[in-house]
A protein has these predicted regions:
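Active-site neighborhood of HAD-like aspartate-dependent phosphohydrolases
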Residues: 1-44
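Short, acidic loop-to-helix structural element flanking the phosphoryl-transfer center
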Residues: 2, 80-109, 115-123, 146
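Helix-loop "lid/cap" segments that line or gate small-molecule binding pockets
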Residues: 28-29, 49-63, 121, 152-153
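Substrate-recognition "cap/lid" segment bordering the active-site pocket of phosphatases
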Residues: 85-88, 114-166, 170-179, 193-195
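Short, glycine/polar-rich helix-capping loops at beta-to-alpha or helix-loop-helix junctions
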Residues: 188-198, 221-225
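N-terminal active-site beta-alpha-beta segment that forms phosphate/nucleotide-binding
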Residues: 222-260
Length: 260
């Protein structure tokens, strides 16, 4: 079945924004005498909105609501001025979005980043390649709650059966599962392929071009293909257990060719 609607996560999926996020949260916490934050610390703290990123970057003994609010305000002020300093689209993303648009796929973006920043980044880097962008908005729960993604899907005019939700984190995979959408994990982002698979990814993409075949042909039903595996091997590939074979097959569902 051909897919007609794409909903992408932003940070770690379309944009490598790690450097600017790290610089901004470090500025915010250092201003109040707390230790700087490393790129790796920032990477593992991203995914649940900037308030959570700031909260997790403040030492536990100082982590009061008042201090979180103060540091969050400093983060937003700095990030608003510097969010395009080091941020850039992942290699191949713009080309993939251009191809999706040419093929009639409607594209939306759903982020836990606050709404004004998400919209500014999409406009700057992708322009009209993205139809609608939702960031974090007042009184609407963040991902993985399905409220926002279902609102976005409705506004895009899509339906669940022909929509792929694409992201780089467990939060994204859980969002898709909660909304009843097909979940595609991207292995170039801030989380590992293992985490994505364990969190409910229906298929993995290792590079943006892998997404194109998923939109053209849909995602294979691995449970059905599993029945065809004989001797825990297929083609010239052999595995110690059936689970290992099926795990590898899941990875190939993003356009990787395997002879069977």
């Amino acid at each position: 079945m051909k897919m007609t609607t794409a909903i992408f996560d932003l940070d770690g999926t379309l944009l490598n924004s790690l450097g600017d996020l790290c610089d901004s949260v470090t500025y915010a916490v250092e201003k109040h005498g707390f230790p700087p934050v490393s790129m790796e610390q920032t990477r593992i703290r991203i995914g649940n909105g900037v308030r959570k990123l700031v909260e997790r970057s403040i030492p536990e003994e100082s982590r009061t609501d008042e201090m979180i609010d103060i540091c969050l305000a400093d983060f937003r002020a700095f990030y608003g001025e510097h969010m395009m300093n080091r941020t850039h689209p992942y290699e191949g993303i713009v080309s993939a979005l251009e191809t999706l648009k040419e093929n009639g796929v409607t594209v939306g973006v759903l982020s836990n980043k606050y709404d004004s920043a998400a919209k500014a980044l999409i406009e700057h880097y992708f322009g009209d390649l993205v139809c609608i962008t939702y960031g974090e908005r007042p009184n609407i729960p963040r991902k993985p709650d399905p409220t926002s993604v279902l609102q976005l899907l409705d506004e895009l005019g899509g339906d669940k059966e022909t929509t792929l939700y694409i992201g780089d984190s467990a939060t994204d995979m859980q969002t898709a599962v909660n909304a009843g959408l097909t979940a595609i994990g991207v292995a170039w982002g801030f989380r590992s392929a293992e985490e994505l698979r364990a969190s409910g990814a229906d298929a993995l993409a290792y590079e943006p071009s892998d997404l194109l075949s998923l939109f053209e042909y849909g995602v294979p039903d691995v449970s059905k293909v599993e029945k065809a595996l004989t001797g825990y091997g297929f083609g010239s590939h052999y595995f110690a257990t059936k689970d290992e074979a099926v795990s590898n097959l899941r990875d190939t569902c993003a356009g990787k060719s395997v002879s069977m």
